[in-house]
């Protein structure tokens, strides 16, 4: 993980008028410029199929950018500087002749970053056309998820890109890896002997990873109904978080050292055969309910819905890792849409002390928890046992938190968005926050066996009302092991 070096490049953004680019990528680039983290010679080429005057499209971009950037962070001077970097080029990404104009617009002296904010089905065609235009040799390509919908299709996508680009110049995005708290997992684990010496099956009882979304499918029906929550969230985000929690110490902080250790975790994931799905996995689909006191439709009532869809909008599962460090330690993963709140957190539950000396009725209190909040209010909290204060309390125990809120502790005016970090790293040529080909494929291989089991059983997802924490069966999933999900849910 090298220090930040601000190096120049040309950033070609394919799909520049799409939702991702307008909602996330351009605001992130604006913020980097605001923080003086874009080199003065860096240029941004906005590429899309839409014809018309470039000035009109750039005016639309400015309007969307003003909506996306908080008013207190908008600076007309920064915008003018950013605007001077921008050019718009209308092109058909699959037409080789369109790349003549791109070739003329690119600075021959600078590296080219080609960001594919497009469907994966056109990745290969874009790569082929970049190569035919003589641009491949100095280009880094950035691939947005989803990379395929199963192992076979992900291999097809990866192989199509690999025909023209080596792995060292392929950057696969998982935006969770750009979150400040996720990056802090590396420092937390490997810079503090307090934790790393306890980070194993001798001291940890179990681990929870929750990624809850308050929204529904938000107009993504066409994509989501073909994917479902397992493909959309577990295959990438949750398994990446699991890897960072479970991996062994890397030999150094280079990209491949970190990714080698993550792959070892993915290889060690215990398969879940079809006959164990009922006891180890819960699928759910939200029905009509309430969010913030307002009535919201069920999944099958959403606009353009297929009324017979059995796509899951919720998944909870118990994952076991077959290695010495984690043998006997279950990892409980949970993710869903239309939850009561937007929440991403990891909870490490430590074991009780080996000998119990306090009052029996207090035994349920005697365990430490490390709570890693990814959103909202990014930070870390360690729950420890202390004596309750007061002369008449005796040796009455209570739980007390040791808090580390990033925004408060470091007096940060704002916590950078994940895409800001990821765009910065790719412009500097750093791969440590990006996903390697074998990570993608081992994650798909593990998820594919779950999907095959579901298809074999042909069971419908369990209903849960919007605004709840999922099907009742997800409570039973952990209760079966004598546990409960952390928090006042």
Swiss-Prot record:
GO MF: glucose-6-phosphate dehydrogenase activity; NADP binding
Record's keyword terms, sorted: Carbohydrate metabolism, Glucose metabolism, NAD, NADP, Oxidoreductase
Residues annotated as binding NADP(+): 49, 92-93, 145
Pathway connected to this protein: Carbohydrate degradation; pentose phosphate pathway; D-ribulose 5-phosphate from D-glucose 6-phosphate (oxidative stage): step 1/3
Binding residues for substrate: 175, 179, 213, 232, 337, 342
Listed InterPro entries: G6P_DH (IPR001282), G6P_DH_AS (IPR019796), G6P_DH_C (IPR022675), G6P_DH_NAD-bd (IPR022674), NAD(P)-bd_dom_sf (IPR036291)
Catalytic residues (UniProt): 237
Enzyme class: oxidoreductase
EC id: 1.1.1.363
Disrupted gene: phenotype observed: Mutant is unable to grow on minimal medium supplemented with mannitol and shows increased sensitivity to the redox-active superoxide-generating agent methyl viologen (paraquat).
Keyword Acetylation attributed: no
One Gene Ontology term, aspect cellular component: cytosol
Induction summary: Transcription is maximal during early logarithmic phase when inducing substrates such as glycerol, glucose or gluconate are abundant. Transcription decreases during stationary phase.
PANTHER family membership: GLUCOSE-6-PHOSPHATE 1-DEHYDROGENASE, GLUCOSE-6-PHOSPHATE 1-DEHYDROGENASE G6PD
Family of this protein: Belongs to the glucose-6-phosphate dehydrogenase family.
Subunit and partners: Homotetramer.
Protein name: Glucose-6-phosphate 1-dehydrogenase
Originating organism: Pseudomonas aeruginosa (strain ATCC 15692 / DSM 22644 / CIP 104116 / JCM 14847 / LMG 12228 / 1C / PRS 101 / PAO1)
Gene for this chain: zwf
């Amino acid at each position: 993980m090298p220090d930040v070096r601000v190096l120049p490049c040309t950033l070609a953004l394919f799909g520049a008028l799409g939702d991702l680019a307008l909602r996330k990528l351009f605001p992130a680039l604006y913020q980097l410029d605001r923080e003086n983290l874009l080199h003065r010679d860096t240029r941004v080429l906005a590429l899309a199929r839409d014809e018309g005057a470039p000035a009109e499209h750039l005016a639309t971009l400015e309007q969307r950018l003003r909506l996306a950037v908080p008013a207190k962070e908008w600076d007309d001077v920064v915008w003018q500087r950013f605007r001077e970097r921008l050019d718009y080029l209308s092109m058909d990404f699959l037409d080789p002749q369109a790349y003549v104009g791109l070739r003329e617009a690119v600075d021959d002296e600078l590296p080219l970053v080609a960001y594919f904010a497009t469907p994966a089905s056109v990745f290969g065609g874009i790569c082929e056309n970049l190569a035919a235009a003589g641009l491949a040799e100095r280009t880094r390509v950035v691939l947005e998820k989803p990379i395929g919908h199963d192992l076979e299709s992900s291999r097809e996508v990866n192989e199509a890109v690999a025909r023209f680009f080596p792995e060292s110049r392929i950057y696969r995005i998982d935006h969770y890896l750009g979150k400040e708290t996720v990056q802090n997992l590396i420092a937390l684990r490997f810079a503090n002997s307090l934790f790393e010496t306890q980070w194993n099956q001798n001291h940890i009882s179990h681990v929870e990873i929750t990624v809850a979304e308050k929204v529904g499918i938000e107009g993504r029906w066409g994509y989501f109904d073909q994917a479902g929550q397992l493909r959309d969230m577990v295959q990438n985000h949750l398994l990446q978080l699991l890897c960072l929690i479970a991996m062994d110490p890397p030999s150094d902080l280079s990209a491949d050292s970190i990714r080698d250790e993550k792959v070892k975790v993915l290889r060690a994931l215990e398969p879940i055969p079809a006959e164990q799905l009922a006891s180890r996995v819960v699928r759910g689909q939200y029905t009509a309910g309430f969010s913030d006191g307002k009535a919201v439709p069920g999944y099958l009532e959403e606009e353009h819905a297929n009324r017979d869809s059995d796509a899951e909008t919720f998944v909870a599962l118990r994952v076991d890792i077959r290695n010495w460090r984690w043998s006997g330690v279950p990892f409980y993963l949970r993710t869903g849409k239309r939850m009561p709140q937007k929440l991403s957190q990891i909870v490490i539950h430590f074991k009780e002390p080996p000998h119990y000396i306090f009052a029996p009725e207090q035994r349920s209190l005697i365990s430490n928890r490390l709570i890693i909040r990814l959103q909202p209010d990014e930070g870390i909290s360690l729950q420890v046992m202390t004596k309750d204060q007061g002369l008449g309390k005796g040796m009455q125990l209570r739980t007390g938190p040791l808090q580390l809120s990033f925004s408060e502790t470091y007096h940060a005016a704002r916590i950078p968005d994940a895409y800001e970090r990821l765009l910065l790293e790719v412009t500097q040529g750093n791969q440590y926050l990006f996903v390697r080909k074998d990570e993608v494929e081992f994650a798909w291989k593990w998820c594919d066996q779950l999907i095959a089991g579901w298809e074999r059983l042909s069971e419908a997802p369990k209903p849960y009302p919007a605004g709840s924490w999922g099907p009742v069966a997800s409570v039973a999933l952990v209760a079966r092991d004598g546990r409960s999900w952390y928090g006042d849910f």
